[in-house]
Amino acid sequence: KPFGTMAAQSIGAVAEKELDNGTVVVHGVTGLERSLDSLLFGTPGLGGSIQLTNGIRTWAEIEPQRGYDIVTTIDIRIQDILETELRKKCAETKAEWGTAVLMDVETGEIKAISNLRRDNADSTYHEGLNYALMGFEPGSVMKPISMMIALEDKLARFNEKIPTGKSFPYAGGRPISDSHAYNSLTPAEIIEVSSNIGMAKITLRGFEKEPWTFRERLAEIGMFDPMNLGIYGERIPLIPKLGNKNWDRISLSRICYGYSTRIPPIYTLMFYNAFA
């Protein structure tokens, strides 16, 4: 690898494998090396040899063919900056791991992607798992996505004040709360102050009677579409399928602000890139 460990999890790694006939081949096992292995591997050559009086003479019966070259969208200069800044931020916050991805707003191309994990032995950070593609509970970064659906479905007006307060004891579940109490908030203010109560109340306006339709709306805007990045290990978001029980309504009121879900960070980036 000419650039060392930069974007190592996404570019991937290779490993040798010995075939039954003793031939050693090299195949991709992670990242692009694995997902594009059929293009990168090429075709091994076949050779034969004959014992002559003056030694062994070997010739190739079928010449090996090189695999294809591939060109990624990674910009190595941006990659270097991104990885350096992620390492600084991880060290500053003493994070166990961190991921950062930079996407071109106009094209959606990935220009840089970094995944770092802390080595507990010396507290330094090295390339870890491809966290950008793994599902995690996103929390409040889900709210703008839910709000986009709410505004498209006209569940709230831009200048409308939504009563919030500090606690919302909904449907017999654990009360929804905010860290700060506000009497009422507009949709923009709900996003600005990250109000769980405001987001839940707006979402329930449109989906309380049929909770499962919220997931259907997420599907309509591409939440479960494969991104087809070409990187082995891509996952799609996991959001529970809801029914028509009281518990499903409670789950809906949590899902809309990012709880009870597992969404890869790169999907969150995709939606935020669309907002931009």
Predicted regions and their residues:
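Conserved SxxK-family serine transpeptidase/carboxypeptidase catalytic domain
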Residues: 1-9, 13, 68-69, 225-227, ...
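Small/polar-residue-rich segments within soluble enzyme cores
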Residues: 1-66, 269
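Flexible glycine-/small-residue-rich
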Residues: 12-14, 74, 104
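Beta-lactam-recognizing serine transpeptidase/beta-lactamase-like catalytic domain environment
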Residues: 49-61, 100-140, 145-276
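Conserved, well-ordered alpha-helix/loop/beta-strand core segments that scaffold catalytic motifs
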Residues: 55-98
